[in-house]
């Protein structure tokens, strides 16, 4: 699956199935192992997790923060394409400096998409 197809599939999933708003494909890209990585950015309809403790998220009147999404194909994931160095380069070159996490969108051959949080650095486990 081509990079543009992967990005379009994730964008449509976020907009029409997950009900995100303000989803856009960022123009900057990162060349990694012969592939081009591009991020999406968008606003989820609700808080995605309870581990980000910021004041503006507790306010009902303020919008949810924008999230960054990195779409990759399952075959790239299996081939050790996604390494710590790749993620570090993604945070450094494609995200804003204040970004603490990105959503990794892994697309299977059947079109299924799963989302995982990837944090910048080591994080203390959250309490339930």
UniProtKB/Swiss-Prot annotation:
It comes from the Eukaryota. Coiled coil: none annotated. The lineage of its organism: Eukaryota, Fungi, Dikarya, Ascomycota, Saccharomycotina. Disulfide bonds: none annotated. This is tRNA-splicing endonuclease subunit SEN15. Non-catalytic subunit of the tRNA-splicing endonuclease complex, a complex responsible for identification and cleavage of the splice sites in pre-tRNA. It cleaves pre-tRNA at the 5' and 3' splice sites to release the intron. The products are an intron and two tRNA half-molecules bearing 2',3' cyclic phosphate and 5'-OH termini. There are no conserved sequences at the splice sites, but the intron is invariably located at the same site in the gene, placing the splice sites an invariant distance from the constant structural features of the tRNA body. It is found in: Nucleus; Endomembrane system; Mitochondrion outer membrane. One of its GO terms (molecular function) is nucleic acid binding. Signal peptide: none annotated.
């Amino acid at each position: 699956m081509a990079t543009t197809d992967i990005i379009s599939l994730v964008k449509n999933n976020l907009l029409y199935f997950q009900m995100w708003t303000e989803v856009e494909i960022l123009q900057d890209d990162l060349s990694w192992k012969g592939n081009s990585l591009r991020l999406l950015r968008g606003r989820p309809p609700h808080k995605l997790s309870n581990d980000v403790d910021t004041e503006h998220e507790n306010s009902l009147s303020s919008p949810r923060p924008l999230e960054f999404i990195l779409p990759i194909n399952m075959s790239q994931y299996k081939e050790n394409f996604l390494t710590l160095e790749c993620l570090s380069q993604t945070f450094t070159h494609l995200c804003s400096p204040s970004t603490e996490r990105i959503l990794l969108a892994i697309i299977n051959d059947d079109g299924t998409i799963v989302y995982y949080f990837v944090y910048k650095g080591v994080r203390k486990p959250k309490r339930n």
